[in-house]
Amino acid sequence: MVSPVLLPYALCRMVSPCSRELESRAPRGRPEPDPGVAARDSGAAAVMSGDHNPASTPTPVQDLQGDGRWMSLHHRFVADSKDKEPEVVFIGDSLVQLLHQCELWRELFSPLHALNFGIGGDGTQHVLWRLENGELEHIRPKIVVVWVGTNNHGHTAEQVAAGIEAIVGLVNQRQPQARVVVLALLPRGQHPNPLRDKNRRVNELVRAALASRPRAHFLDADPGFVHSDGTISHHDMYDYLHLTRLGYTPVCRALHALLLRLLTAGQAPPQPEP
């Protein structure tokens, strides 16, 4: 997930145990507004209101290596959707992709008739392109799980959050019967760093944005990967980004519990009116 290209499965098996402003005079007695803060808030509002944002503009991955793997995977996902009837669809980056290699997938999610549409290195703009180009056309899942955003390098937290919200909106439009579960971005890096702060801010923005969407759910399944000294253990994230089996376990069990609740609620008969 570190590079914008697909992680080779052989490498994953080798290293992963899973093979996880306008100025105005302030009234007397009040402090002067900070123009920098005003500009930042104005920019954030513009991004979230739908102005041009690269993180919410559907974009395919550039085939820099020249082997066409990303597009091949996309075409395979579209083909898979034509002859399967999943109840749950996972879509996102390598954290979704690598989950498919873990026994936890077979234990928890295969029984739910789940499809895995994860591609290593994907950002929100890439997932949007895939969803707009066939990956949702031939299926009617009950739940779509979205886990993407940590690869949006060069985009602000506000842009990434708007990209995630655009994905939710697209799923709501294309699959109105489905609920959308958005997984929070995890902390990353062995030691405290700006990307952790950015991911935390993305989570805050997405949680707030989804609060007004009745068919969308935000799940922060981080069990506490950051220790009291500010470090992340390689036992949880083997490269301080991707999860080990130990790291995947609490995340997947929390997600599985939510999926079961949503699926069960969807099967409940309507209650008679009093």
Annotate the PLM regions:
Residues 187-274:
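Catalytic His-Asp segment of secreted/periplasmic serine-dependent ester chemistry enzymes
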Residues 91-93, 148, 219:
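Active-site flanking residues adjacent to catalytic metal/cofactor-binding acidic residues
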Residues 89, 145, 179-181, 217:
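A structural signal for isolated positions on well-ordered beta-strands in alpha/beta enzyme cores
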Residues 114-116, 218:
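Conserved beta-strand scaffold positions in the cores of enzyme catalytic domains, especially
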Residues 97-108, 113, 124-174, 181, ...:
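Oxyanion-hole/transition-state-stabilizing segment in secreted/luminal serine hydrolases
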Residues 61, 116-121:
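Acidic/histidine-rich helix-loop elements
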Residues 1-91, 95-107, 262-274:
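N-terminal secretory targeting modules
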Residues 96, 121, 223:
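Short, glycine/acidic-enriched loop or turn micro-motifs at the edges of active sites
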